[in-house]
Amino acid sequence: MIQLKNVERSYKTGPGQTWVLRRINLEIQQGEFITVMGPSGAGKSSLLNVLAFLDDQWQGEYWFREQAAHAKKRKDRAELAKKNVGMVFQSYHLLDDLTVMENIDLPLSYKDIPRSQRQTLVADALDRFQIVAKKDLYPSQLSGGQQQLVGIARAVIHNPALLLADEPTGNLHSSQAKEIMELFRELNQQGTTIVQVTHSETNAAYGTRTIQLRDGWLVGDTGNPRPTTEPSDAAVNR
């Protein structure tokens, strides 16, 4: 599904430059659930931004579904992202002046979808994420966990082939975090490819593969045993 070849990213710092990604070579297969881990400043979020087409200042090759994304214009990359990628941010990124229903509908409003069909899709998402009662509220009226559920609903409503999540449970208490990770597992079992950035070993245990970054370099790539049950209490409390 995805292949990165010698992808690098740097920022100018005075007369020199600071590298945040160094010679990244990575393949991601359809249906994988990948966790990206590493210390602060390792390049985790930078990698996610490249995968999401939010950053186009990198060097190297990015193949997405056999398309050479690195050879496309910015407008064409944005179109590729709209059709294929959903993004969940740690800070939610909901629009304050839109209701829950309107926030979830936003990705659909960019597509040529009849209004009646959009309304049905939004209603299904509200029901799926158990936030029907919150549909007319604004983000400021929601708890952190509720806002994150809205963010996830918005990210997946157009059935993206790829779901990217940057510390999606970082500000949540354990029960909310567990609920969101169970939703991720369900989405993955239904065929969605997921790449999450996290510091949490508990969250990492939900994935099928863990990638380690350090100082911009990919230093580890290991498969995770697929759990038949939810992570143990011992793992949750680590």
Question: Regions from the language model: what does each represent?
Answer:
Residues 11-12, 222-224:
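Short regulatory "switch" loops immediately downstream of catalytic or recognition motifs
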Residues 2-210:
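ABC family nucleotide-binding domain
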Residues 225-238:
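ABC ATPase nucleotide-binding domains
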Residues 31, 104, 220, 229-232:
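Intrinsic disorder/low-complexity signal
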Residues 210-223:
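H-loop (His-switch) and adjacent beta-strand-loop-beta switch element
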